Amino acid sequence: IVGKSYSCTDCGRSFYAKGHLLNHQKNHGGEKRFTCTECGKIFTRKSNLRKHQRIHTGDNLFTCTECGKRFTEKRNLLIHQRIHTGEKPFTCTECGKSFNLWSTLRNHHKIHTGEKPFTCPECGKKFSVKNSLRKHQRTHARKKLFTCTECGKTFTKKSTFHMHQSTHTGEKPFTCTECGKSFAKNGNLRIHQMTH
């Protein structure tokens, strides 16, 4: 983390050299010109389109021997395999906590520095991670994303919406393997399982 002095204002990623930052920023603001004919996804670089197209053709994919998930790049497979091995090669020098991704360590480090480069344009609240800002911005949305057709209640999260819908349908998809009792919410199943 120390020594990386060029930071991307869009995602917070840091670089040692200004040239690397400028090259990276093309991904955010570049004119997207290369379109996948299979799925319509658009890319700023032809090389990224070619890599993406391997998903559709199945050519030169790297497959995880543990779970079968496939990747277009070997480095992404190696990063993914840390899920199975439990390897966490990136350690915080401040508190000793370890992470499986460099980007996760970088975001964690902001806890110690107090850095919050992402500001909500609606209310001015600041965040250390862009994803946290995105989640927060959904709370400002005038029109909620998911509306229940039964009662009109609205939700910003799809998972909460589906959970709510089960109150109308009576659906109980979470079943205890010990006794067969079913629950509408996974959390209720977990609480129940502690009784066995």
Curated annotation (Swiss-Prot):
UniProt keyword terms in alphabetical order: DNA-binding, Metal-binding, Nucleus, Repeat, Transcription, Transcription regulation, Zinc, Zinc-finger
InterPro entries cross-referenced by the UniProt entry: Znf_C2H2_sf, Znf_C2H2_type
Cellular-component GO terms for this entry: nucleus
Zinc finger motifs (C2H2-type), residue ranges: 6-28, 34-56, 62-84, 90-112, 118-140, 146-168, 174-196
GO biological process, one term: regulation of transcription by RNA polymerase II
Gene Ontology molecular-function annotations: DNA-binding transcription factor activity, RNA polymerase II-specific; RNA polymerase II cis-regulatory region sequence-specific DNA binding; zinc ion binding
Major location category of this protein: nucleus
Localization terms from the record: Nucleus
Domain of life: Eukaryota
Function: May be involved in transcriptional regulation.
Family named by the database record: Belongs to the krueppel C2H2-type zinc-finger protein family.
PANTHER family, A to Z: GROWTH FACTOR INDEPENDENT 1 TRANSCRIPTIONAL REPRESSOR (PTHR24390:SF159), ZINC FINGER PROTEIN (PTHR24390)
Protein name in the entry: Oocyte zinc finger protein XlCOF26
Organism annotation: Xenopus laevis (African clawed frog)
